[in-house]
Structure formats: structure tokens, C-alpha cells
């Protein structure tokens, strides 16, 4: 069995790639399982994989490295229950030091398993960081570039969202900076690109990659700069405009964060357990996939927001957006669950160096 481990910063496109790769594998008669990972306890991506009937497990309340035993138990559970040919394991986007804390323990404790390692990077954010135009804190940037430094395979994602000239310039920079790595330029909605990535993974030889020196003080500081906000809402409307209100709430949250110039890791929303909307850190946001044309009197919305600010500030922004939406759309928004926090200091269960 193979485990395809994915790293990469928040909003880098890991989940989309996994979702479409699972679809391609299923067409070929292969069984795939997924393990998602987050610092919180309710994850948009986990709910989405459930809706798509893709066998999955979730490692919550911390990264793979700090919850390695939970990761191992999740692998075993998928093997016993679903017997997958391939497992995709997606590490939380604020995590690095994957080789020493996840890959080497996997190779030690599961020597029969083949492990590949891909790190994803949104081409637009990478361009901003290389040009020093991003407002992410230096400690957050440290995590970002360590993720790329330790990768075997670098997947430059979302290339469809950048113009051809800029992409060519980025290719020249990336090919020079990461010449020692396999480099893929990918639109994960493009079937040919997904098939190319899967081919690279299939042909990747078994290796024992080298661990990186990691300054855990900077690493911990970087994680602590990011606020996590998870919230489950129910939107109720006697005017049958719950969909419009939900769309308005999503836009208001995004606009308030951008107005305050807080760098966004990602904003993920899941409507009624099945429709996902993702927004990231770039000034030119992707177009909203509008949901405002549906007429219904209630809607469920799960929010996962990861933003460089304090948990209190992020929680206040969402609360104000809820109040404004209730007034504007004459609706009632009920909070079913809510958690705002900063990730704790990284304390890996294992750290195997060379």
C-alpha cells in the first residue's frame, strides 16, 4: 500500500487535488482513502469527503506530528475497514518538519508502506512571498519556505489563476530555486494535470529523505501568529432567502478581513454539508460561486477561518458580520458551535533526525 503525504501552506490547493485524484483512481478501479488533519475539531474538508462518499478519517486537535499515534490509528482503521490501495494524508497547513516527525516514523514503524511526499504552493502567494509583497509575519514565512525546502515533489498549484507571462517568470524562478526537486505546475481541476501528478507519485522511488534543521522557537511563533475560527451556523428565514443571506454573510466576512488587511491563510465554508466555497489571501479574489438563486427558509453553514490576527479579533469580525447579515436580510442566525484559538506550541511525538 502507498501513502501519499501532502504538505503545503493553508489554501494551497491540497484538498482539491486529493478530491480529484480520488475520482481518477476510482475510475481505474483503485480504492483510495483520505486522512485530513487540523488544529480544530470540525473540518470543512472532512465533511466534504463524507458527502462525496470517499472513505476518510480525521486527525484533529493538532498536527500529524503531535498526534502521530492518531495518524497511525487512522491508517490502520482505513486498512481494516476499506482496504485502500492508496491513502492520501493531508497535513495541516501551518505544519512543517514533516520528514523528521511523520515520514521517518512511518518508514520505521510501517516499513512495508511506500511513502511519497508532495508540498503544494499556490503560485500567486509564492510569487508575493518571493517578491516580499506579502504581509504575513516573518515567522509565518519561515514555516512556508521550510515546507518547500523539505519537499521531494513541489506542486505549484492554481496556475490557471495567473497570466501566462507571470507563470513563465515564476517557472524560471522556481526551476532555479528548487532545481533539486521534482516540480509540477498544476491546475487541479484539469484531469491531465491530476493524472500527471498521480503518475509521478506512482513512479517515485522509495527513499529515506533527510531531515531539516528546524528552529522550533520560530516555528512555534509562526503558528501562534495565526488565529483559528471554527463555527457551525443555522440561517433561518421566513422570507425564503436563507441562501441569499448565507451568500451575503460569506462576502461580509471576507470583506471585513480584507478591509482590516489581515493576511488570510484560508476561508472555507461548507453549505448544507455539500457545497464548498474557498477564499484565500490574494487581493483579486476568486469569483463567488453564487448560491443566492435558491429559495429556502433555512441553511446550514460550517466556517473554517485561518487568519493572521488574534482569535478574539477574528471572532469579533465574524460576530459583527452575523449581526449585519441578520439586519440586512431580516433573518435569524443561530450559532450551533464555536471555537476560536491559536495553535499550541508544536511538540512532536517522534522526531527522527539523520
List where the protein language model places each region:
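P-loop NTP-binding site
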Residues: 1-6, 11-12, 16-17, 203-354
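Helical mechanochemical/support elements of P-loop NTPase systems and associated helical scaffolds
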Residues: 2, 67-70, 98, 140-147, ...
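Nucleotide-state-sensitive switch-loop elements of NTP-binding domains
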Residues: 2-7, 12-142
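Structural motif
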Residues: 37, 91-93, 159-160, 189, ...
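Short, aromatic/basic amphipathic alpha-helical patches
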Residues: 46-53, 168-176, 317-324
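A short acidic, often aromatic-flanked loop/helix-cap motif at beta-alpha or helix-coil junctions
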Residues: 63-66, 189-195, 341-345
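Short acidic, S/G/P-rich loop/turn micro-motifs used as interaction or catalytic elements
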Residues: 94-95, 126-127, 161-162, 239-241, ...
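Canonical P-loop GTPase G-domain recognition
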Residues: 141, 145-223
Amino acid at each position: 500500500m502507498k501513502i501519499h503525504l501532502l504538505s503545503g501552506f493553508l489554501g494551497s490547493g491540497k484538498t482539491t487535488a486529493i478530491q480529484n485524484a480520488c475520482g481518477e483512481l476510482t475510475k481505474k478501479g483503485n480504492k483510495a482513502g483520505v486522512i485530513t488533519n487540523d488544529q480544530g475539531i470540525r473540518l470543512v474538508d472532512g465533511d466534504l469527503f463524507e458527502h462525496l462518499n470517499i472513505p476518510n478519517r480525521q486527525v484533529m486537535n493538532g498536527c500529524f506530528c503531535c498526534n502521530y499515534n492518531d495518524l497511525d490509528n487512522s491508517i490502520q482503521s482505513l486498512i481494516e475497514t476499506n482496504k485502500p490501495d492508496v491513502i492520501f494524508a493531508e497535513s495541516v497547513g501551518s505544519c512543517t518538519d514533516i520528514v523528521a516527525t511523520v515520514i521517518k516514523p512511518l518508514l520505521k514503524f510501517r516499513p512495508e508502506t511506500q511513502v511519497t511526499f508532495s508540498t503544494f504552493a499556490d503560485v500567486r502567494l509564492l510569487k508575493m512571498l518571493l517578491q516580499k509583497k506579502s504581509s504575513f509575519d516573518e515567522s509565518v514565512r519561515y514555516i512556508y519556505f521550510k515546507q518547500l525546502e523539505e519537499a521531494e515533489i513541489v506542486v505549484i498549484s492554481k496556475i490557471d489563476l495567473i497570466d501566462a507571462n507571470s507563470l513563465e517568470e515564476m517557472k524560471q524562478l522556481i526551476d532555479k530555486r528548487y532545481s533539486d526537486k521534482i516540480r509540477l505546475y498544476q491546475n487541479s481541476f484539469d484531469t491531465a494535470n491530476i493524472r500527471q501528478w498521480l503518475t509521478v507519485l506512482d513512479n517515485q522511488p522509495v527513499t529515506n529523505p533527510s531531515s531539516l534543521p528546524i528552529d522550533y522557537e520560530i516555528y512555534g511563533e509562526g503558528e501562534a501568529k495565526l488565529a483559528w475560527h471554527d463555527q457551525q451556523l443555522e440561517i433561518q428565514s421566513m422570507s425564503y432567502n436563507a441562501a441569499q443571506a448565507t451568500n451575503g454573510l460569506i462576502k461580509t466576512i471576507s470583506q471585513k478581513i480584507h478591509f482590516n488587511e489581515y493576511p488570510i491563510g484560508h476561508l472555507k465554508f461548507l453549505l448544507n454539508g455539500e457545497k464548498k466555497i474557498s477564499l484565500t489571501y490574494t487581493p483579486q479574489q476568486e469569483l463567488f460561486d453564487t448560491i443566492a438563486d435558491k429559495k429556502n427558509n433555512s441553511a446550514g453553514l460550517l466556517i473554517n477561518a485561518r487568519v493572521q490576527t488574534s482569535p478574539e479579533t477574528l471572532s469579533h469580525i465574524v460576530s459583527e458580520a452575523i449581526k449585519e447579515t441578520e439586519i440586512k436580510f431580516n433573518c435569524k442566525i443561530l450559532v450551533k458551535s464555536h471555537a476560536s484559538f491559536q495553535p499550541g506550541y508544536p511538540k512532536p511525538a517522534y522526531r527522527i533526525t539523520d
